[in-house]
Amino acid sequence: MMNCRVFSPLLVALALVAFATPRARAADLIRPKVIVLATFEVGADTGDKPGEFQYWVEREKLTQSLTVPGLDRPVRFNDQGVYGVVSGTTVRAGAQIMALCLDPRFDLSKTYWLINGIAGVNPHLASEGSAAWARHVIDGDIAYEIDTREAPADWPYGIMALGNKNPKDKPVIPDWAPKPMSWTLNPTLVAWAFALTKNVALLDSPEAQKHRALYRDFPNGSRPPYVLLGDSFASCRYWHGAVMQKWADDWTALYTKGAGTAAMTNMEDHGLANALTRLATMGRVDFQRVLILRTGSNFSMPPTGQSAAASLVAEYQGMIPALEAAHRVGAPVVHALVKDWAKFEAQTPRP
């Protein structure tokens, strides 16, 4: 009894510290309103040849920086609560975002995400320089594959879903196969972002005009760039060609049950969606606050009369229009979220 009475004041003090410390730390947590996520940058963040990040850093005045362990580049931010991060490409993107979101200095539970980058655009749906708000993300990596040249003559391509016998049948996904194969973004939030930006004037260039004139057999591919609703087909391989585009179209229809259209192809969105959904189950982020905006820097398949090989290695004609579109279309959404933060912190926007 004597020992208990002697140590009881110390125990009480320790208990008070233990309860007070989380509250004190909570007051110091970093709470971004919006995180703009680019996947790569060329050289420096400012003042040189631009990648996906540079226009955001320069135009949103992301002049402050913070080093986060596990990230290749510092996080940039401004006083308005807009943060910018470069995730890296391919599977590295998901790993770096996990590192960011698990950093104990951040509270990202109310943060909105704008995944914002260039992509290969499907000429059946849009032209270079166009911007597509994704409703769905499709994983194009997990598959059986043989060289198409070795495939049976009646196969459209040499890729099929795990558990399948051929690519034409609807697959019965085995229990052991990784899941999910697609992610659906918050449809109300996507509709709001699209309604806010659908009439944004996009940059066109003489080079892009000349290039898309080759796509005269594609009405949407030969039109000036515009803002659309179109989904994100992601795989770590940089593929190109009409056969591969058909595969992307078919898999998008398959894994969205006919609701999706493969508008933009990229190498990161499936990894990012996978990471963010897992982080959401941990209470670190809110997946209902995630937006994906992809802009066409190049076509995903050649025009009539050109080989896929020649088209693949041709110089991008839509790079600068795509980088410009990423900011022109994304910025109004970021600004609206920040301006009405008193409302949007508690509830997501509606059209």
Over which residues does each language-model region extend?
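N-terminal secretory signal peptides that target proteins for export/translocation
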Residues: M1-C4
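N-terminal intrinsically disordered, low-complexity tails enriched in polar/charged
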Residues: V6-F7, D28
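Bacterial N-terminal signal peptides
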Residues: S8-A18
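Sec/Tat signal peptide C-region and signal peptidase I cleavage site
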Residues: T21-A26
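Accessory terminal and edge-of-domain segments that mediate assembly/interaction
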Residues: A27-P351
